[in-house]
Design a protein with these regions (language model features):
Chain B
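The feature captures the beta-strand-to-loop junction immediately N-terminal to the Walker
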Residues: 37-39
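Conserved ABC transporter NBD signature motif
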Residues: 60-68, 77
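Conserved ABC ATPase "signature" region
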Residues: 113-131
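Catalytic Walker B motif of ABC-type/P-loop ATPase nucleotide-binding domains
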Residues: 160-163
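H-loop/switch region of ABC-family ATPase nucleotide-binding domains
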Residues: 195-196
Length: 245, 221
């Protein structure tokens, strides 16, 4: 698959184009268009749509809920739906809600596109783009710790339930309290991890030498340049067209 | 002795691993101290997690306090059986020691004064009263283990599973832990102590269950 061979730097450019476009463009139809393009790009990168929906089901529901809330609380002159004379949904609100949902969806899809590359390769791409090694290394470390924190979060959820707490039965007010208790050990444990890593890095003389040799070296191919140039040119044209409408 | 947990034909295999628990049959009773021992990787912790419902068995049945385990949610099992993880850090949530005991009780609807009284009594029993305002994560390992036990006992379980409770404890603390286990057993609470410290188990357990490669090879009942 060519998609698997695409250089992570090409994906970074693509993602930058998508996210920049969706933030700059204001026209509803064009915003929705960017949403469709981002999903198409994810599919071209080999992402399975159904698996993606299943994986991000909860986030998608959250995004949809946020968008609906935004629609309801945005006033506007043209009322679409009202209860006892109180406007609940306006045309402007609906437009704002859709735009919010698509914008967050594009950000989510961008993350998915980047996740199709091995994180080590992504970091190597950044290093070859002259991003300071220390910053690239920190980014790699933070990515490496995501599964660890996920596991710790799941363990904390289990441990809380073993205290006899039924998440489904507790009232909404107390649910927020529960999340504070869930997040506290994760923050403390991340601080502990950071402290331990700092000691381990110091003891291995991290950064003692200015120059480094690389085992993994990425090379941009012709199609990488093609995709990057096309993405930039198409993005500029798209934004220009959207601003002209 | 009253039977509290009954395991019949329990088997469990981890995905993508050759290790499996095979045909585990045992009865754990209230008021007794059972030592579950075996080499590293013999399945002790896996067995504890299956009893707690953290892992679901591939086959077999578990009956807890007369109720089929399949009908018990994690939180319901947690009210019947207390579980102390190998790593106490995973069970500490609150910003101070006293709140660690109080908050689950309050969330479950217990009156604040009652919860505070209960916490004070447990902190006293576990010699943690002087640390009640401290951050749990900053305690020593032994103090953390005592706090986890205190918080677990606040749920008034009928049975306790302790995973490697003696790890990191000095001789005096191990002795104190043993005395506490005896006290709890006398109060009618059953205890299963998962440990590879055979000396600790042999000295303090009423019954020793030995696991080898996921199978019970000795049940000294």
């Amino acid at each position: 698959m060519m998609a698997a061979k695409i250089d992570p730097r090409t994906k970074i450019v693509l993602v930058l184009c998508l996210t920049s476009m969706v933030l700059v463009v204001e026209n509803l139809a064009f915003v929705v268009g960017i949403g469709i393009i981002s999903i198409a790009c994810a599919l071209l990168m080999g992402v399975q749509l159904l698996a993606l929906i299943r994986r991000y089901q909860r986030i998608l529901i959250l995004l949809l809920t946020l968008s609906i809330v935004q629609s309801i609380f945005t006033p506007g002159p043209k009322v679409l739906f009202e209860v006892f004379g109180i406007p609940l949904l306006t045309e402007k609100g609906l437009e704002m809600g859709i735009k919010t949902f698509v914008r967050m969806l594009v950000i989510l899809t961008s993350g998915v596109i980047m996740s199709t590359s091995n994180y080590r390769e992504t970091i190597q791409g950044l290093i070859q783009w002259k991003v300071p090694y220390k910053i690239a290394f920190m980014t790699a470390l933070s990515l490496r710790f995501i599964p660890i924190f996920t596991e710790e979060f799941q363990d904390s959820m289990v441990a809380l339930q073993l205290k006899g707490i039924d998440f489904k039965k507790i009232p909404f007010g107390k649910k927020t309290q529960i999340y504070v208790y869930l997040i506290t050990p994760i923050i403390l444990s991340s601080l502990k991890h950071a402290e331990e890593i700092a000691i381990a890095m110091e003891s291995r003389a991290f950064g003692a030498y200015q120059s480094r040799v690389e085992y993994l070296v990425l090379r941009l191919k012709g199609y990488d340049y093609g995709v990057m140039i096309a993405a930039v040119l198409l993005s500029i044209s798209y934004v220009w067209a959207a601003l002209m409408v | 002795m009253e039977s509290y947990i009954k395991l019949t034909g329990i088997s469990y295999g981890y995905p993508r691993s050759r290790f499996a628990l095979r045909d585990i049959n045992m009865s754990l009773n209230r008021g007794e101290i059972v030592g579950i021992t075996g080499e590293n990787g013999s399945g002790k912790t896996t067995l504890g997690k299956i009893i707690m419902g953290i892992l679901m068995p591939d086959s077999g049945n578990i009956v807890i306090d007369g109720v089929d385990g399949k009908n018990l949610k994690l939180c319901e099992r947690g009210s019947k059986i207390g579980y102390a993880f190998q790593n106490p850090d995973r069970q500490l949530f609150a910003a101070n020691v006293r709140d660690e005991i109080i908050f689950p009780l309050e969330i479950k609807g217990m009156n604040k004064t009652l919860a505070q009284e209960k916490a004070a009594a447990l902190l006293g029993r576990f010699e943690l009263s002087h640390l009640k305002e401290r951050v749990p994560m900053r305690l020593s390992r032994g103090e953390k283990q005592r706090l986890v036990l205190a918080a677990t006992l606040a749920q008034e379980p009928g049975f306790l599973i302790l995973d490697e409770p003696a790890t990191g404890l000095d001789r005096d603390r191990k002795k104190a832990l043993y005395q506490l286990m005896e006290e709890l057993a006398r109060e009618g609470i059953g205890l299963a102590v998962i440990s590879h410290d055979l000396q600790f188990i042999e000295h303090h357990a009423n019954r020793i269950i030995r696991l080898e490669n996921g199978k019970v090879v000795d049940d000294g009942c």
